[in-house]
């Protein structure tokens, strides 16, 4: 079994919790076509009513997908969006989740990245992400430095940490794959 195929099965079956008969839409562009079709094929193999739409690559991160794509996103159980530019912070994605879709975006994903990262132990990823989110929630200040001269200090007061576990099984769930952010 190829690394990309196995990673696609993990994404659809384990991380999105897809079950036979659920509707699953893959939104992709020319730069992510191979990843998109691997996800589509995994969904079909698992018995989902799989659909794939290839749109023209967006110019910027956060640019809305075409209106017909946004409309379909609101009428499916699961949206997987491996796109060259992120659609995470778009009205289309937010409205799809508000309508009950489970959504995962995979901005800039490559075949190699997907094959290497989606086989991670997502129970451990989620636990680590929640632990760091809790630290951020309880913290007052964060300072970020590196050897290249970065030295940023900022307040965390009034901010809530948010864990991205990579597991999106409930209606309206959303996050990025690969996951693990806090």
Give residue spans per PLM region.
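Active-site bordering "gate/hinge" segments
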Residues: 1-182
